[in-house]
Amino acid sequence: STSLRTRLRLDFDEIAILLFIIFYWVISITGNLNIGVRHVLPTFPFMYLLIIGQLKRWLEHRAETSAVSKGRFTLVIFLLAFYVISSLTVYPHFIAYFNEFAGGPDGGYRYIVDSNLDWGQDLRRLKKFVEKNNIDKIKVDYFGGGDVKYYLGDRAELWHADNGPTTGWLAVSATFLQTSRAYSWASYEWLDEHEPVEKIGYSIFVYNIKK
C-alpha cells in the first residue's frame, strides 16, 4: 500500500542517516586528530533530524485521553523554553555553555577543555578584572594566542604549573588547570584546596592565595 511504501522510505532514510552519523563518529574518534567537538559538528543537523522525526511521531501517536496528548505538548514546550533560558543565562560567554547534566558552565571544564571551552577569549576580561580590583601583581598561566603583557603590562608575571604552589594573585586558564593533572611533577592539583575568587568567562580561574 501507499502508506507502507511511505513508511519503508522513512525508515530507510532514518537508517541511512544513523549509519552516516555512526560512521562519521567512528572515523573522528579513532583518528589521530581529536581536539574538540567541532570535529563532529557536521553530524549535528542529521542528529536533529532524527530527534525531530521521533518527537513528531511521539506527539502524533494516538493518546488514551486528550489530557495525555496535551501533557505531551506541554512537556515539549516546557523543555524548549528551559533550553532557551538556560542558553541565555550564560550570555555573553556562549562558548562556555554546558547543559545542567554536565554541571552548567561552572562545571563543564571538568569534562572537556581546550577548544571545546577555551580559546583564550577572556584575556581582555581578565585585564578589566585586574584593573577593577586594583591588583598590582598577578601570576598568569594563559592558554591562547593573545599577548598577556600587551593587556596587563608589568602587572603580569608569566607562570606555569611546574613552578609549584605559590601565594598571591594567580590566574590560570581552565585548559592548563585540567591538563596539568596528567603530570604529577607539574600539576595544579594543589589548587583544589582553594576556591577561585572569580571564573572569568568560565575559562580563566582567578585565585587570591593567602598562604
Where are these predicted regions, by residue range?
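Signature aromatic-anchored transmembrane alpha helix within multi-pass, membrane-resident enzymes
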Residues: S3, I17-I22, Q54-P92
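Transmembrane alpha-helix segments characteristic
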Residues: S3, R7-I29, E189-H194
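Membrane-interfacial loop-to-transmembrane-helix junctions in polytopic alpha-helical membrane proteins
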Residues: T6-D13, N32, G36, V68-G71
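Aromatic-acidic/polar surface patches that form glycan- and anion
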Residues: F12-I15, I35, I112-W119
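Generic recognition of stable, solvent-exposed alpha-helical segments in well-folded globular domains
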Residues: I17, I21, V37-L41, F46, ...
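Hydrophobic/aromatic-rich transmembrane helices and adjacent perimembrane loops
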Residues: V26-I27, N34-K56, Y207
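Transmembrane alpha-helical segments
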Residues: T30, Q54, V76-L117
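C-terminal luminal/periplasmic domains and tails of membrane-associated envelope-modifying transferases
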Residues: A102-K211
